[in-house]
């Protein structure tokens, strides 16, 4: 809708314009300050230019009213233009608010949690954000590949093997053991141990020479758990990339960095000259024992990413990785690549409440709130929606009891109720699409036109949400649209009125916006409640 209006104005005026949406729809559906940008060139006041352009831009099939106000030009869309957009949408629902394929290829990496334990509630935020961002981007025509980086190299894997051994000795064999603070905790370790005993026998767990293999078996067990938990939230990845599988290319990567003069040795360690690109200090990439650091693994991975020739790379990291961005970008530059193609989005902490009090963590679950636990308690739809009600880089606090309420305090219930309400009106009225498809908006009242206009904003909301990497734009829009639907329903008699089918056509486009918007957030709109 916005693109059609913008293209018409630019064609008539033969110049690029900015098109804005006034906060008060009574002023118009769109406005442009183009007269201000033309004032210097035309040597006239913006007010005079705006008045002259109004006549030039008149188009009754597109605009019901064009008005110059203080140098701005306000446009009110015609009912018949809105009707044509609704007719197109309702006859081609699967493509509503969708855009054509774009040439830009994007690699989107998110979650990438260590395969040492199940996902917790903090991981869930990045997972839901990343999945929704991918869904919206793909719908808008971008070629997006989603990827999970498995951190299966380094000391955390050795620690996993030791933790499985200790958990087995404690809970299965009843030994008196003490847990070092750095060891992993949780019932999943016992599950791993039981699986190993079943497959290899109990003696296998006691033999120290098997600890590395135990760690690998544990990693596979945990990754299967992670994949299942993600799938329960409707999240699947195109690629899984193992850190360990990339380490064979470290020597080649190191050689390139050395040739670029980006490494130096000090105190038996090898450093990356990351301060040359704004880092606080140069970073160790090889320890004094000759083992590459965690940063070295990330350097290899990002080289691998760039070697695959995407146009843009998006990483979603936990907020605690903020300081890590500069050093990774420095390495990208040293490898001869363009670090501006890498965009790092941060996912902030989550504070979970229950009944107004902090949610209690279970020691048996490792003193974390498991993602699977909350998904089971409130459902994937509620969890997905609430996690997208705030921008990902801001703190999020919510009470899970609120998400069980059957009223407007529960946003996903409120939105779903609006959609189900419309569906049930059609059922009660005994009306189908053929009964309303030819209905004209010529006599539609202002309330109806406003609801139609709001419903048709979905595409521009999606474009803005993806461009700003802010899914909150969509959740806000859907909640406000649901509010408008409820208001319209409460203020206008529908079934049995003279305007019944006209109003049903209005509600049809509103329901379609709700359905498509929720789908792009990974949520299925309810038909009945």
From Swiss-Prot:
Q: What is this protein called?
A: Arginine--tRNA ligase
Q: Which gene encodes it?
A: argS
Family, similarity comment: Belongs to the class-I aminoacyl-tRNA synthetase family.
Which CDD domains does the annotation name? ArgRS_core
Q: Which organism is it from?
A: Aliarcobacter butzleri (strain RM4018) (Arcobacter butzleri)
Q: Which reaction(s) are listed as its catalytic activity?
A: tRNA(Arg) + L-arginine + ATP = L-arginyl-tRNA(Arg) + AMP + diphosphate
NCBIfam families for the chain: argS (TIGR00456)
Keywords, ordered alphabetically = Aminoacyl-tRNA synthetase, ATP-binding, Cytoplasm, Ligase, Nucleotide-binding, Protein biosynthesis
Positions of short motif 'HIGH' region: 113-123
Q: Which EC numbers characterise this protein's activity in its record?
A: 6.1.1.19
> What are the subcellular locations of this protein?
Cytoplasm
């Amino acid at each position: 809708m916005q693109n059609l209006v913008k293209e018409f104005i630019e064609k008539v005026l033969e110049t690029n314009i900015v098109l804005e949406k006034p906060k008060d729809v009574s002023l118009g559906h769109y406005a442009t300050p183009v007269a201000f940008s033309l004032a210097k060139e035309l040597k006239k006041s913006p007010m005079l230019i705006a008045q002259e352009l109004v006549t030039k831009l008149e188009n009754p099939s597109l605009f019901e009213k064009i008005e110059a106000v203080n140098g701005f030009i306000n446009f009110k869309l015609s009912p018949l233009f809105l009707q044509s957009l609704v007719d197109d949408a309702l006859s081609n629902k699967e493509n509503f608010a969708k855009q054509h394929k774009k040439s830009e290829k994007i690699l989107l990496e998110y979650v990438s949690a260590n395969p040492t334990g199940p996902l917790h509630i903090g991981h869930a935020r990045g997972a839901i954000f990343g999945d929704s961002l991918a869904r919206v981007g793909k719908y808008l025509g971008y070629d997006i590949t989603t990827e999970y980086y498995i951190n299966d190299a380094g000391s955390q894997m050795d620690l996993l093997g030791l933790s499985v051994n200790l958990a087995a000795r404690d809970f299965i064999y009843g030994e008196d053991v003490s847990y070092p603070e750095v060891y992993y905790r949780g019932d999943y370790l016992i599950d791993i141990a039981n699986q190993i005993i079943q497959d290899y026998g109990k003696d296998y767990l006691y033999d120290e020479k098997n600890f590395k293999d135990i760690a690998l078996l544990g990693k596979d067990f945990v990754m299967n758990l992670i994949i299942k938990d993600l799938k329960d939230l409707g999240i699947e990845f195109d690629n899984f990339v193992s850190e360990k599988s990339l380490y064979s290319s470290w020597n080649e990567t190191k050689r390139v960095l050395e040739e670029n003069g980006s490494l130096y040795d000090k105190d038996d360690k090898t450093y990356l000259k990351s301060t040359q690109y704004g880092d606080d200090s140069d970073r160790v990439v090889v320890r004094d024992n000759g083992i590459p650091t965690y940063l070295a693994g990330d350097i290899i991975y990002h080289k691998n990413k760039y070697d695959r020739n995407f146009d843009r790379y998006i990483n979603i990291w936990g907020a605690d990785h903020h300081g890590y961005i500069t050093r990774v970008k420095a390495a990208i530059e040293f490898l001869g690549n363009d670090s501006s193609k890498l965009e790092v989005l941060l996912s902030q902490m989550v504070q979970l409440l229950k009944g107004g009090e902090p949610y209690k963590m279970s020691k048996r679950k490792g003193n974390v709130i498991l993602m699977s636990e909350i998904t089971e308690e409130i459902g994937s739809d509620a969890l997905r929606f609430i996690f997208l009600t705030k921008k990902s880089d801001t703190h999020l606090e919510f009470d899970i009891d609120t998400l069980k309420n059957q009223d407007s305090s529960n946003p996903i219930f409120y939105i779903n109720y609006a959609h189900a309400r419309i569906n049930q009106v059609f059922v009660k009225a005994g009306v189908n699409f053929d009964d309303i498809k030819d209905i004209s908006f010529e006599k539609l009242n202002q309330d109806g036109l406003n609801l139609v206009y709001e419903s048709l904003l979905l595409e521009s909301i999606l474009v803005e949400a993806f461009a700003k990497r802010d899914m909150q734009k969509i959740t806000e829009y859907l909640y406000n649209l649901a509010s408008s639907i409820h208001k319209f329903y409460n203020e206008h008699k529908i079934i049995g009125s003279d305007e019944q089918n006209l109003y049903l056509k209005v509600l049809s486009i509103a329901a379609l916006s709700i359905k498509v918007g929720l789908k792009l957030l990974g949520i299925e709109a309810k038909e009945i409640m």
